[in-house]
């Protein structure tokens, strides 16, 4: 009877398995030895596809970032595009929170992250934002999204009513926050995003008015 064939080792399979290990046990738990074992191969086999562990991590980071939708910058007004992008970005990161610290190191050499930054910056500049301000806006949204994905505010409170009632009277209901994690965390994100976009919209109006008034008449 022929022996069952092992699944073909590919870059995509390596990346998917590495991400699954990171999701399960954290970024620090990933090693080439453990990854090879999970794939059912010897460690050196990985180096036919990736030269180093950092290359694997970059590919994992790129796979996560590649799921972010930036299509709104080509078809919608800049406020709607930023909103859609921020929510899509948050969904991609909260699905894999353990990789967020690595993603936070910056786009650097990662194609998907650079493509995302290019789409955001290009969309904002086309909308009339000054280049420097477009850079600031993209960075601000990125900080906001990444920070929200690093951990849950609601889950940071223990389910012990006595702890809060005895020492922190204004937090007497805090033990219930974990029950409402999704609504609390998403509601907080929506509030912050709305405030940020509202402020940017007001600034945009002032910026456009300034540019228009500076143009020569006639």
How would you describe each model-predicted region?
Residues 1-10:
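Short, Lys/Arg-enriched anionic-surface-contact patches
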Residues 69-113, 131, 141:
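Hydrophobic alpha-helical connector segments
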């Amino acid at each position: 009877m022929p022996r069952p064939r092992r699944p073909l080792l590919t870059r995509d399979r390596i990346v998917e398995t590495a991400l699954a290990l990171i999701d399960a046990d954290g970024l620090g738990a990933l090693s080439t030895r453990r990854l090879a074992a999970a794939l059912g191969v010897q460690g050196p086999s990985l180096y036919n596809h990736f030269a180093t562990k950092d290359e694997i991590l970059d590919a994992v980071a790129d796979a996560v970032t590649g799921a972010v939708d930036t299509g709104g910058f080509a078809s919608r007004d800049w406020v709607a595009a930023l909103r859609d992008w921020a929510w899509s970005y948050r969904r991609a990161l909260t699905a894999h929170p353990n990789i967020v610290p690595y993603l936070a190191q910056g786009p650097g050499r990662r194609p998907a992250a650079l493509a995302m930054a290019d789409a955001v910056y290009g969309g904002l500049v086309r909308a009339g934002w000054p280049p420097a301000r477009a850079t600031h806006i993209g960075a601000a949204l990125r900080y906001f999204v990444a920070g929200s994905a690093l951990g849950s505010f609601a889950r940071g409170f223990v389910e012990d009513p006595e702890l809060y009632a005895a020492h922190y009277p204004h937090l007497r209901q805090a033990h219930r926050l974990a029950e409402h994690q999704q609504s609390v965390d998403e509601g907080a994100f929506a509030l912050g995003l709305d405030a940020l976009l509202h402020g940017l919209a007001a600034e945009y109006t002032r910026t456009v008015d300034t540019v228009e008034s500076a143009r020569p008449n006639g």
